[in-house]
Amino acid sequence: MSQLLEPSAETIKAERLYREMGLTDDEFALAEKIVGRPLNFTETGLFSVMWSEHCSYKNSKVLLKKFPTDGENVLQGPGEGAGIIDIKDEQAVVFKIESHNHPSAIEPYQGAATGVGGILRDVFSMGARPVALLNSLRFGELESKKVKYLFEEVVAGIAGYGNCVGVPTVGGEVQFDPCYESNPLVNAMCVGLIDHKDIQKGQAKGVGNTVMYVGASTGRDGIHGATFASEELSEDSDAKRPAVQVGDPFMEKLLLEACLEVVQSDALIGIQDMGAAGLVSSSAEMASKAGSGIEMNLDLVPQREAGMTPYEMMLSESQERMLLVVEKGREHEIKATFERWNLHAVEVGVVTDDRRLRLTHKGEIVADVPVDALAEDAPVYHKPSKVPAYFDAFQQQAPYIPEITEANETLLKLLAQPTIASKEWVYEQYDYMVQTNTVVEPGSDAAVIRIRGTNKALAMTTDCNSRYLYVDPEMGGKIAIAEAARNLVCSGAKPLGVTDCLNYGNPEKPEIFWQLEKSTDGLSEACRELGTPVIGGNVSLYNERSGGAVYPTPVIGMVGLVEDVAHITTQSFKNAGDLIYVIGETKAEFGGSELQKMLVGELSGKAPEIDLAVEKSRQQQLLSAIKQGLVQSAHDVAEGGLAVSLAEKMMECPFGAEVSLSLSAAELFAESQSRFIVTVKPSDQQRFENTVLDAVVVGAVTESRKLTIRNENGNAVIDLCQDELVKAWKGAIPCLLKSKA
């Protein structure tokens, strides 16, 4: 074995150095048992990253099995770089969401930027051209210097990378709550398009075929990044800044174009991104999936730092790198393409038939372990689960019913809450028009991207109200799926499938594991009912510090198909005189609501209820009406209730609304589920009402640029001009950022 100046196998075991790498005593013993001998330093490192939660899902795998992953249009489910769904005409959509939470907490610009880079590579490693980026962000209250710094730097990192690489950032969401103060969540999603014939797999097939390393050189950045992402943040986390990767979007652009060129060649057998766990995960996973092995000579790996050890080379998470398997004898074809793009393309190994990962360095074997042991044999845990005391208390509480005496003031204050307020400050930093396919820009219910050369378009969104999930994880899980689907339907799209990013605290705490368990129950039930299979995703646990865990935050990335661009619908009012309809009933449901947080400062009670059969029926009826051309505008009712949703429909158009509702002032802000606000031409009234059975006409669009909401007695409960609404909504975030902490 290696003569390098590293701890011996005896020292690793005696001093339990494996613990510093993230392995438990039992896990280290199991790894040694599988290999059949003591592990050296490099081998211990390989197991530590591959058996981390980030790579192995050892604490969540038992729950992920609940998700429906099959469907008539699913071409690739979980297990590859990204999932794929057929959209007919020999085309498919490829999409995936991933987290970069821990890196963004200590180095927000690079943490966010490399999160974008990694998710792009996941998509183009499948052979797809990325056409859109989205993100879902969570921060503490926008008051302290620290939170403002994290917010500004994360947004700048996303913009800096996405804008340079030439992929539009078209949508997302931002939520602000105290639980994210020290634990920001940064989830990045990418959507790509592909022809069926170009679909690639990350597999190392064909004994004797060549393993090639392409892209940027390997440095010491990101070593143990996967392990770092699998532990709680602490006061010592800043010392792990080297575990944060550094991105180069211009290198990524070259790599993207070169990879999309080589996928056209049948000399390419397999391709995978070197993401979490770098060269270890890409080589072990590609070999394991193909039932093969890989032998690599680490002397051949391009290095940008002197004296790198095998341990460092294998665990580095340097960005903009891919691992390819190429047909033996045709390496020159692949090299020629990468050289034309001024990129490394180096032969570093060969595919073997012994199902082992064998690494050599300076003429010595420095690691020799079974690939399946690394990629498949991590222990799987079903952690103890315990109902949190707060949940039992919430279930016993009388419903929270606020008293609203001044509805105008309440609406303006709600519009200025950072979670509801306009995110224009965020998305104006993104180039959302690059590639010139963006039809519906950020700010509506979902972004829409046209598919060139066809009459079709893709709608996409990210959604999760984590407050509902804290109050009731199972109900909140159902709502997260339903709201994402509602946003797509409001845009004229049929929901196709889901990619999820499950962000939670420490699963070793029974109350946290219970949250994970119950929310996955809700998510899976809703996916089955609404016909949206989960085709991939990511789990990010240990999102907590001494102050406590984040709310359960399973971010839902959902993509839908607009079958005809004529069906594209947006939220803004279109014509004066159009009838305003509310679909769905309003109940006095305020548990976990924006109003409760604003008035009380904390959450309690029961989450809004949802009937998935009713949800499905309303979505189908509304989509049918949209396809018939009966709907002028559509918007789902979410945070802040009907009053906020009506105001949002006025923000970007020269119209107002006159509405009458038989609701109390408080109920105007209730967050009951399965509701929509749509507008319809008077001439289409009968056909619309025959199609959408739950729709009730409540008023009309006016030219007055005022929002007037009357009660059943005809008295104006809300009466505000557009300028007041826009000022509160658009000015909130810039104003908070300028204020002194």
From Swiss-Prot:
Any matching Pfam family: AIRS
Pathway(s) where this gene product acts: Purine metabolism; IMP biosynthesis via de novo pathway; 5-amino-1-(5-phospho-D-ribosyl)imidazole from N(2)-formyl-N(1)-(5-phospho-D-ribosyl)glycinamide: step 1/2
Keyword Aminoacyl-tRNA synthetase recorded: no
Keywords, comma-separated and alphabetical: ATP-binding, Cytoplasm, Ligase, Magnesium, Metal-binding, Nucleotide-binding, Purine biosynthesis
Active-site feature positions: 54, 100 (proton acceptor)
Positions of substrate binding: 99-102, 121, 245, 317-319, 540
Subcellular location: Cytoplasm
Binding site for Mg(2+) 1: 98, 538
Binding site for ATP: 57, 96, 500, 537
GO cellular component assignments: cytoplasm
Molecular function (Gene Ontology), one example: phosphoribosylformylglycinamidine synthase activity
Binding site for Mg(2+) 2: 122, 273
Entries under Gene3D superfamilies matching the protein: PurM-like C-terminal domain (3.90.650.10), PurM-like, N-terminal domain (3.30.1330.10)
GO biological process per UniProt: 'de novo' IMP biosynthetic process
The protein's role, per its UniProt record: Part of the phosphoribosylformylglycinamidine synthase complex involved in the purines biosynthetic pathway. Catalyzes the ATP-dependent conversion of formylglycinamide ribonucleotide (FGAR) and glutamine to yield formylglycinamidine ribonucleotide (FGAM) and glutamate. The FGAM synthase complex is composed of three subunits. PurQ produces an ammonia molecule by converting glutamine to glutamate. PurL transfers the ammonia molecule to FGAR to form FGAM in an ATP-dependent manner.
HAMAP family associated with the record: PurL_2
Record's subunit section: Monomer. Part of the FGAM synthase complex composed of 1 PurL, 1 PurQ and 2 PurS subunits.
Homology family: Belongs to the FGAMS family.
Protein name: Phosphoribosylformylglycinamidine synthase subunit PurL
Organism lineage string: Bacteria, Bacillati, Bacillota, Bacilli, Bacillales
